[in-house]
UniProtKB/Swiss-Prot annotation:
<keyword id="KW-0408">Iron</keyword>
<keyword id="KW-0503">Monooxygenase</keyword>
<comment type="similarity">
    <text>Belongs to the cytochrome P450 family.</text>
</comment>
<protein>
    <recommendedName>
        <fullName>Cytochrome P450 monooxygenase apdB</fullName>
        <ecNumber>1.-.-.-</ecNumber>
    </recommendedName>
</protein>
<dbReference type="InterPro" id="IPR050121">
    <property type="entry name" value="Cytochrome_P450_monoxygenase"/>
</dbReference>
<keyword id="KW-0560">Oxidoreductase</keyword>
<keyword id="KW-0472">Membrane</keyword>
<dbReference type="GO" id="GO:0016705">
    <property type="term" value="F:oxidoreductase activity, acting on paired donors, with incorporation or reduction of molecular oxygen"/>
</dbReference>
<dbReference type="InterPro" id="IPR036396">
    <property type="entry name" value="Cyt_P450_sf"/>
</dbReference>
<feature type="transmembrane region" description="Helical">
    <location>
        <begin position="20"/>
        <end position="40"/>
    </location>
</feature>
<dbReference type="InterPro" id="IPR001128">
    <property type="entry name" value="Cyt_P450"/>
</dbReference>
<keyword id="KW-0479">Metal-binding</keyword>
<keyword id="KW-1133">Transmembrane helix</keyword>
<dbReference type="Pfam" id="PF00067">
    <property type="entry name" value="p450"/>
</dbReference>
<dbReference type="GO" id="GO:0044550">
    <property type="term" value="P:secondary metabolite biosynthetic process"/>
</dbReference>
<feature type="binding site" description="axial binding residue">
    <location>
        <position position="457"/>
    </location>
    <ligand>
        <name>heme</name>
    </ligand>
</feature>
<dbReference type="GO" id="GO:0005506">
    <property type="term" value="F:iron ion binding"/>
</dbReference>
Amino acid sequence: MGFVNTLTQASDQENQRLRASPQVFKLFVLILFVLLVLKIRRHRANRITNQYGRQICELHGDARVAKFAFSKQLSDQGKALAGDEPFIIRNGRARELVVTKPEHIYDFYKGDTKPCSLLGHAVGALAGERWSMIRRYFDPAFSFQSARQAIPELSASIDRWLDDLPLQGTGTGKGFALEIKKPCRFLPLRLAAEFVYGEIFDDKLFSALLDLNVLHEVILHDVIANKRLATRLGCWFDRAAAKRMEEFRSRWMEFNLGIIQSARGASKACPAERIYHGVEKGDLKLEEFLHTLDEILFANVDVSSAVLGTLFEHLAVNTAFQQKLRAEIETHIQTRTHTPDTDSDIDINTETGKYLSKQDTLMNFAVMEAMRLSPAFDCDFAAFSLPECTAVPKEIGGYRVPARCPVVIDAKRLNADRATWGKDGDTYRPERFRDIPPSKSRYGFMRFGVGAASGRCLGKHLADTLFKLTLIAVIERYSLHSVHDGPEVELREVVVRV
């Protein structure tokens, strides 16, 4: 009987399994159907069409690496595909809308936007309450007034950089020649670090900062090449990259906390130490403090140095404009030198600050034109901005764009757009700014951002100051000349009339 019962039970279980099989199959089919419906709905929701139902153009292939490493080619491909209209590129699984015209930028910024950047907890990647709290502690150190007060220290550092310049070049008989971009490579980093860390910063700390910058660049390329590194799970698939990220976090924290401790022990002025009070009070998170310093010092190293390189290379070619600029700077030096000597240092600082603040000078035009051709937005590369997301559905360039769509700006095309800059938008002509009112270039000029977004750049006053002080110092000491058949610039000493 036991054997019979066993057979009966086995038979019953088999019958139950057979009866359950269709139910399992039906459930499986239902799940597939639901997933398919959701995918179709998501696809339809993400479709970007114009009022006639025509779908927006999309470049084939993954542009995640290309938009940084081959940005010019990608920009040209987009123009060939879509003309002056917005178009779509792929960034891994994400689709990003590329905008190129001032009217596109206006449409985009009409409502709120949300950052979608690689900057973590830095101020450039946040919004709302956390953004306001970070700015509360960082803004005083990076205000217009703070940048102007730092003129003597910044000027002294630039003079030391200039003293070393002939040693990096090759003698020409009349002067010396060098690839001007090379000595400009880390000047902005040095000046920004001295500004942030104050009196405690020295050559030894700068050497440590350069080592950190090398590691930072490797990590940036890791993240660009592998988007999964932005997630905890993704880090498990590339342990070497994850270890580099952890090493940088540890060394970056040690570097900054060590400076703060040294500044306090020596009773030396250090803006970073004052900002750190926000961490100690619990208003700032330590990672917000560290990530924002990371953004200030590392995120714009290549772009800031490119602005200086572009500035001097074009001045070397455009000698007529250079001569007019030198005459203007000589006039400023005469004014600065002949001020009443009640307190000469303060007077020189005040006069230089006034000159730097003027918007109608050839010096300002020269810097603006260099920035137009090498836009200094929050990215290490010069053509495409980091993405920001639409907060609500919008119509951009005639296309209906859904909420949460990442949008990037092709600054190369925007900064040469004929509607703003005329037919010679691709050429260097600084005096064009005399005829272009700020209202016309508000959405057509990518410097520290466009429109209201330009006000969010924490370091814009510092950048403007160091660009102009470097220009004054170079033109005061040297005339620049292009060298045929090469990338070098020849520098010849000049005597400035005072």
